[in-house]
From Swiss-Prot:
Protein name (record): Heat-inducible transcription repressor HrcA
HAMAP family xrefs: HrcA
Record gene name: hrcA
GO biological process: negative regulation of DNA-templated transcription
Single GO molecular function: DNA binding
Gene3D superfamilies cross-referenced by the UniProt entry: 3.30.450.40, Winged helix-like DNA-binding domain superfamily/Winged helix DNA-binding domain
Keyword Transcription: yes
InterPro entries assigned to the protein according to its UniProt record, in alphabetical order: GAF-like_dom_sf, HrcA, HrcA_C, WH-like_DNA-bd_sf, WH_DNA-bd_sf
Amino acid sequence: MSRSWISKRESKILYILLTTTELYLKTGQPVGSKTLKEYECSNLSTATIRNYFSELESEGFLKKNHISGGRIPTDLAFRYYVDHCADFSQSELPESTTRLLNQLPEESQNIVKDLQKALEILGEALQLPTCFSSPRFENDSITNIQISLVDEQRVVVILSTEFGQVFTETLWLPETSSPASVKRIETFLQSYVRKQPPTEILSQKEEDLGMTLYNEVVVRYLTRYCNFSEEDLYQTGLSKLLKYDAFKDPDTLALGLSFFENRRHMCKLLDIGMHRDRPTAFIGNELSTIFGTPNPQCAVITTPYYMNRTPLGAFGVLGPINLPYREIFQTLTIFADKVKDSLTQSFYKFKLSFRRPCPSDPKLSKEPTLLARYSSIKLLPPKETS
């Protein structure tokens, strides 16, 4: 047997593999020899195709559907397909996808809010759950505060910042407060953070309570903002999994949801993706190998996003293993380029900067001066309430 003959046979077998995988992705149905012959392999007999199927099955690339007798690609087949075909761009993206990508935010100082909007647009374009990782952006400031009474002695305080961060904390009240009193305190603090004259006249007790609530929530916010051990993670669109046949099985859906909601797993995949220069796919058993867990029976695709040439984080999508990889890779590439253009303009125009996580830096929790170094947020001294 000559080496050239073996190479030619291998080439045919791999062609059958790629064609079978492509057809399965298009139809979602097991592929039989007759179907494949009609689709792309008219020069081969069905018997020859079945022989190739058997060989690919023995190598772990295909598995037989016992109902129809057709073949279904395995995780290994999808890996081979992604490595050899996913980067080959289609002629053009669907018009609906292009229209959505054109809605991505322009340059602004609302970095986190804009990234979150971009995340929603990406999820809508791909109809998949999406996530992204982000560093912390420096010199942020509070732009709004909201206080909602949970019961007689608990309130939820919500801080909104200039860069689009939202921080929520539940605080206990030292004594019972009425809804009207809490509303007056909220209005007073809103005037303070917006640097406007107060519109509410508070009693001394309300002033003291307002100052206590504000300082408590700001200290908690600054501690969390400055002392962090991993990138921030934002996720959305879990319900989109329900539209896929693979996730109509409750056990498969539970595995996918559990994996996507595991912060450690998603942060690690996004960190890997951030250091690649192109979209990266993690398919089925590969996820099991990385984390030492049961196969989540899903796929995650990540792509880095940049400020100029500096990677800031990564976007990711999660879905069934039989994803339209070519379309997703192309969409993610165009999406990341648009995000890069917007971020680069924003960083230079607004002179923005950012910080990476510091998992081994104990000083942040011990030196109060470090808490304020990276933010323009200040505590409320007693004299400012008088």
